[in-house]
Amino acid sequence: MGHALELKTRYSLADYLQHEEQSPFRSEYFRGELFAMAGTSDVHNEIAGNLYALLKGRVAGSGCKAFIENLKLELQANEHYVYPDVMLTCDARDRADRYVKRHPRILAEVLSSGTEAHDRFFKLPRYLQLP
């Protein structure tokens, strides 16, 4: 995740979701703050793509779905939304919302020098709290 955008006020969840629909850039949301997502390298993209392809092939026909990079995960309702690099969900409740998933079975982050600290020390503890 990148740096917080310059904010004069905090964003409501509705403002964030509207911003995401209109913006060419992705941002993660945490308690009213938006964090611009950093671009990825070709190596990062290839690793995430390979993992996505592997998962997608393994779960074909099972009712599970694999997603890559551009789909939000709700970590805490109305408080915290992120974009995992790769996500797998098998929960029927996740079929209701095309843009946000809430019940992942597998989450993966491809670490890079620019995101490693944030992914390890901010996102990972929150991922581990998911049921």
Placement of each model-derived feature along the sequence:
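Gly/Pro/Ser/Thr-rich low-complexity, intrinsically disordered segments predominantly at protein N-termini
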Residues: 1-131
